[in-house]
Amino acid sequence: MRAMSFLCFFMLLSPALFADPAQDAERNGEQARTAFLACSRFVDGWLQHADPVSGLIPRNLTQDFYWNAKDAAADNYPFMVLSTWFTNRAVFDGPMHAILTTEQRVANRVGVLPDDFLFATQAFRTETPNMPDLIFGASEYVKDGLLPLNELLGPSPWTDRMLGLLDGIWEHATIDSEVGMLPSTSHEVSGDLMQGYSRAYWMTGNTAYRDHAFQLAAYFFEHHSPVEAPELRLDDHGCEVISGLSEVYYIAARDTNDICIPQRCRRRAR
């Protein structure tokens, strides 16, 4: 019985033990080729629909022919950049860098915070800026797009854009709260920002980013616990506050001797 059990166990392991490295490499190479070709086609397809004047890509291909921060900039453009970094360095060095330069030139509306740029008029889509919308769009651009981009590329012009947006968002913190002035108190935006400021702290060592993250976390840990809120959504939007608080928790666990850490966050980290 023991011998039979050993034989069965050996037979289960044998494919892995005796796999041909050359076959594995060939299979992995084919999978990588398929993925890279798809990435290349994705970029080529979107660039065919870029605005011929500005070179920016639209929000979608059906009706929203404008560049915006929360969709075009956050969810599409950065992954075009990543795709071309792997598949086409000429496009990476050319159109991808050009889009970054152009979107800051034409879409920045309040300081470095971008607004929707309408292709038909080559101007802002609305007559006046809406600050909550600008902060939301910038936070999405940071968290959804620029963070993964920077974590692969390292220091680059996109790093400057990300840090500039994080600085600009805090410059427009106008919501008076129990922990001081905040740029937002929504679960989604605050969660985006806690993730952004936490990563920026690890990237740069700048304690201002850590302190911004702690201040946002204190609002929730000390006064407005998400688990006590009327609604805690764990979908693609509401879940951001959980991720953000988790990243601040980790910083607090590592830096528990720093006086800037909110007391409740420190207690939970212990």
Residue ranges and their predicted role:
Residues S5-P15:
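Bacterial N-terminal signal peptides
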Residues A19-R270:
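Glycan-recognition and catalytic cores of secretory/periplasmic carbohydrate-active enzymes
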